[in-house]
Amino acid sequence: MPRFSKSVRVPYSTTQAFDLVSDVARYPEFIKWITALRVSDHRVDETGVRHCRGDAVVGFKGFVERFSTTVTADVSEGAVIASLIKGPFRHLKAEWAIMPLERGGCDIALQINYEFRNVLIAMLAAANHDIAVDRIMSAFLSEAHKRYGSSPSASVPG
């Protein structure tokens, strides 16, 4: 099963990073290939973890697919996880981890595990998954800069 991951160090607070990553409804505003997204079934469990359903339409290189995920956002763990409900995948799980840094800022890690049902789409995805994860992370970093500008902790050590 294909798996890819990317981690970046950013000057933003864990709260800012978590708010951005968990703001699923706004993904179409800054991730180009998400052409539509409906978020529903919002609830907060007894531990304060937020849950919702996301129904997305994704277009890439002439292919258009629809899929649904359950999204779990746990601020205390700095984790946002999207798990497949239905769609063109046999398996899909995207996990964001946001970890504070001692001197300010945070590390943001994204890991995606997936397997497409359609062999042609699987081959297209395999040829482009490194590009895709880089573009996803770049889209989030660009959106963070738009929303939060340069943070006081912009000189986060690498």
Segments the model singles out, each with a brief description of its role:
Residues V39-I85, A139-K146, S155:
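Glycine-rich portal/gate segments that line the openings of hydrophobic small-molecule binding cavities
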Residues A25, H129, V133, M137-G149:
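Short amphipathic alpha-helical signal-transduction/dimerization elements
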Residues A17-V21, Y27, G54, V71, ...:
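Hydrophobic pocket/interface hotspot
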Residues M1-V49, R103, S150, G158:
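Hydrophobic ligand-binding cavity/cleft-lining segments
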Residues I81-R135:
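Beta-strand/loop substructures that line and gate deep hydrophobic ligand-binding cavities in soluble
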Residues R3-S5, R53, V64-S68, H91-A94:
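Short, surface-exposed coil-to-beta transition loops
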Residues V10-T14, A56-G62, A73-E77, P88-R90, ...:
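Beta-strand elements of well-folded, non-transmembrane domains
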Residues R9, D19-S22, T72, A125, ...:
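Amphipathic alpha-helical interaction elements
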